[in-house]
Swiss-Prot record:
Basic and acidic residues bias spans: 17-31, 78-89
Entry comment describing in which tissues the protein is expressed: Brain and interlimb region.
Region called Disordered, residue ranges: 1-31, 54-146
Protein name: Protein sprouty homolog 2
Subcellular location per the Swiss-Prot or TrEMBL entry: Cytoplasm; Membrane
A Pfam family hit: Sprouty
Gene name of this polypeptide: SPRY2
PROSITE patterns: SPR
Keyword Transferase: no
Main location (coarse class): cytoplasm
Described purpose of this protein according to its UniProt entry: Acts as an antagonist of FGF-induced retinal lens fiber differentiation. Inhibits TGFB-induced epithelial-to-mesenchymal transition in retinal lens epithelial cells. May play an important role in FGF-mediated patterning of the mid/hindbrain region by acting to modulate the signaling effects of FGF8.
Composition bias, Low complexity: 108-131
Native source species: Gallus gallus
A single GO BP: animal organ development
Family, per entry: Belongs to the sprouty family.
Amino acid sequence: METRVQHGSGSQALLQARRDSGRPHGEPDLRDVLTQQVHILSLDQIRAIRNTNEYTEGPTVAPRPGVKSAPRSASQPKSERPHGLPEHRHFGRVQHTQTHASPRAPLSRSISTVSTGSRSSTRTSTSSNSSEQRLLGSSSGPVADGIVRMQPKSELKSSELKPLSKEDLGAHSYRCEDCGKCKCKECTYPRTLPSCWICDKQCLCSAQNVVDYGTCVCCVKGLFYHCSNDDEDNCADNPCSCSQSHCCTRWSAMGVVSLFLPCLWCYLPAKGCLKLCQGCYDRVNRPGCRCKHSNTVCCKVPSVPPRNFEKPT
């Protein structure tokens, strides 16, 4: 028989002709009766069924496509595949048809095998992930908005966040019993005469340096610095000191140098004036106690009652 057969109907006609050639014309075939009772689905109907999306966006649980189509696959294992074709060819044709059915959405494929008797039929079920991605996108919206991407800046200063210590609470509460002034270290520290840097911060302009350079004592300090062999000797800093070593030698050397530099005789009076100015400046600017021997009294700050802001009647 030289007839051109096509995909579905041609193979069935070929099988029907082979069965008719081997039996009498009067007897009905049992296979024909079963084939007429079982509804055979065409490729177009299979493609329309597989393309449906059974996902829902509501909280209700949708029935799974595998559970719903299980009775159909069990009752019709032979009708989904044409008779006489190999199993792998039929599976490749169905998979190719379903791939071209929905090319726009990403598909997730799962293969399930159902066995009936000694034969098994392979089914391919496809489902779209677009609803799943839409649900995930809507649920992750509030979470993404609540993420802190930048550290908020604190409006409080660092000094306000520090806990108050005992020294801060009672820093100025200790008073002198005689004069009544504060006896903390900050208030009792002696105040010195002001000074500043000049010549691009290379020279310190202070009252002590003015006296040293004005009376040529800086030359004597340089002479003692280069003639001293002891690194720990401080005679170059205080050449007129009587408490350090080599006191007689230093005073004798200064007497000889004063013959060539008579301005050295003004050093002692200028030093006395500097001490007097320093004492006056300290007395005016030091807020604390200057008593040498006095008792300390702890004074508490009196509590001020809250003001009443009500209007008088």
